[in-house]
């Protein structure tokens, strides 16, 4: 009986060691000169971060419209899902950065008006800040980007604008921007596409698309640069954004861009994105190793 007791204790210690937990902080801030104020962001640190001195790969994980830096934590269960993927050996230990792109005005683009430059903030202030503040490996091979909906569009945008910075990009249920002038007007009241303006015209539409529409950016980009990024595109068959994601798949295939494309059962929901995240973590980890 005594031997059985010690065996049980030993097994408990063993399994507790195998199921280590990472750490999440969701109210971190940095001062932004570009956006003129404090900006919030969240971070996931892997289980062994506090007990090691090593540096880690990084995933920039972007939230969707109406959410903020806490979205992936509160609704996406990023902490639990990433812990499980790391402990199961499906994902390499990594740091995940989740910035707020809702405060002030929503979106990941630079506004057409020039008054709000979120993309500049992301590359010129956020990335240098977090990669200095945390033990992050600062080169393309160990940097990935993903996001859902508006954040899926943002991950397309950033990897297409700066393929030199990311080894992998995994847009989920991506919103890739307005396909008509009328669509631009739908979100004009929240400045979603650039700046508050109720009478968007063809010139605005063409200007926005040239700068920010992934369908156009694929055409403009160098094929070798695009293929230096590993692409993973995922959208539900009941998602209202499925058409544009299929168009991106077809455009990339036509251009000769290597990519993985998934249409799975599901809609535009956290249930869908929670089931997508493990595959994203496994996919980007293939390059991190």
Predicted regions and their residues:
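A periodicity- and composition-biased signal for non-globular, repetitive helical segments
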Residues: 8-10, 45
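Non-catalytic cap/lid and distal C-terminal segments of serine-dependent acyl enzymes
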Residues: 20-289
């Amino acid at each position: 009986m005594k031997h059985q007791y010690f065996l049980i204790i030993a097994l408990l210690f063993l399994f507790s060691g195998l199921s280590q937990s990472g750490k999440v902080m969701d109210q971190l801030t940095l001062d932004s000169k570009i956006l003129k104020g404090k900006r919030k962001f969240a971070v996931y640190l892997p289980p062994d971060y506090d007990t090691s001195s090593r540096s880690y790969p990084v995933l920039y994980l972007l939230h969707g419209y109406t959410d903020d830096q806490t979205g992936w934590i509160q609704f996406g269960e990023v902490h639990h899902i990433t812990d499980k993927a790391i402990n199961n050996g499906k994902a390499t230990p990594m740091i995940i950065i989740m910035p707020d792109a809702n405060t002030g005005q929503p979106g990941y683009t630079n506004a057409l008006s020039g008054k709000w430059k979120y993309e500049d903030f992301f590359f010129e202030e956020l990335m240098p800040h977090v990669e200095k503040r945390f033990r992050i490996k600062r080169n393309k091979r160990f940097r990935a980007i993903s996001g859902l909906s508006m954040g899926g569009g943002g991950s397309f945008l950033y990897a297409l604008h700066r393929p030199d910075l990311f080894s992998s990009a995994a847009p989920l249920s991506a919103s890739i921007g307005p396909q008509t002038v009328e669509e631009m007007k739908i979100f004009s009241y929240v400045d979603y596409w650039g700046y508050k303006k109720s009478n968007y015209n063809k010139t605005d539409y063409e200007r926005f698309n040239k700068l920010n529409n992934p369908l156009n950016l694929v055409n403009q980009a160098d094929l070798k640069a695009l293929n230096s990024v590993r692409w993973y595109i995922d959208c539900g068959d009941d998602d209202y954004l499925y058409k544009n994601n299929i168009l991106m798949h077809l455009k990339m295939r036509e251009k000769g861009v290597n990519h993985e494309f998934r249409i799975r059962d599901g809609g535009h929901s956290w249930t869908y994105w929670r089931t997508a995240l493990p595959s994203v973590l496994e996919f980007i980890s293939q390059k991190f190793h």
